[in-house]
Regions:
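Solvent-exposed loop/turn segments flanking beta-strands in beta-repeat/beta-sandwich domains
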Residues: 113-134, 171
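Middle-to-C-terminal accessory/interaction subdomains
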Residues: 1-120, 190, 194-205
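Short strand-edge motifs at loop-to-beta-strand transitions and within beta-strands
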Residues: 146-150
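Beta-strand-rich modules
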Residues: 152-171
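Residue-level recognition of well-ordered beta-strand positions that form the cores
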Residues: 109-111, 126, 163
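Short beta-strand segments within Ig-like beta-sandwich modules, predominantly Fibronectin type-III
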Residues: 137-144
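Extracellular fibronectin type III
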Residues: 167-202
Length: 206
């Protein structure tokens, strides 16, 4: 959805219908029974070599874990299909803009979300001093337009989280993320308010 071309395609109902047909056709072909049979055939070829020297020294899984993973693979098709169906009932993700400081105010905006069912979408905004959002300094719910304004916080690090909610009550977070030692924390943007009242965005280069 973050790609402009894909957005244009997915906004077309006819395209989505054809996409559904193609996915269901592939899903029918990749049945659990068929995948299970194919996986067992590959296992008989691959596994004996994987757990012999020197390959076994680098194997990321034990033999038992390998068998468990192989046995679970056929179920992945149905699980992923259900996730795809569920995703179409939610608002689409979006990006949070870089806040702007104007006098003693901070203005925040973000891209519009999108509903495939043409539902009304409202937004909630939270600003916290920590990425776990345990120390929240600002919250606003039920916003109809993608922007909000608040008093410029004191100098420091802040995290912004915006969520979109449609009429069904389904929610969606923003594309943005913050990187910690534990990994990526999705749905938020990190900024810094400087001593002179300027706003700097946190930039992470992968």
């Amino acid at each position: 959805w973050g790609n402009v071309l894909f957005q244009r395609c997915l906004k077309s109902e006819r395209f989505r219908e054809k996409l559904d047909e193609a996915i269901l056709d592939l899903k029918e072909y990749l049945s659990e029974e068929r995948l299970g049979t194919m996986i067992e055939k590959y296992k008989t070829v691959v596994k004996p070599y994987l757990y012999e020297m020197p390959d076994v020294f680098y194997a990321p899984l034990t033999s038992e874990q390998y068998d468990e993973l192989a046995a679970s693979l056929p179920e992945e098709i149905e699980k992923n299909y259900q996730l795809y169906v569920e995703s179409l009932s939610k608002p689409m993700p979006f990006y949070i803009g870089v806040p702007v400081a104007e006098g003693n105010k901070m203005k925040i905006n973000w891209d519009n979300s999108y509903s495939f069912d043409a539902e009304d979408i409202t937004y909630s905004v939270e600003i916290a001093k920590d990425y776990l959002f345990q120390d929240v300094i600002y919250t606003q719910d039920g916003l109809l337009i993608p922007e909000t304004e608040l008093e410029l916080p004191e100098a420091g690090q802040y995290f912004i989280r915006v969520r979109a909610t449609n009429e069904k009550g389904k929610t969606q977070d923003a594309f943005d993320y913050y990187v910690t030692d534990e990994g990526k924390q999705y749905g938020m943007r990190c900024i810094y308010v400087t001593e002179d009242g300027q706003i700097e965005e946190d930039i992470y280069e992968e």
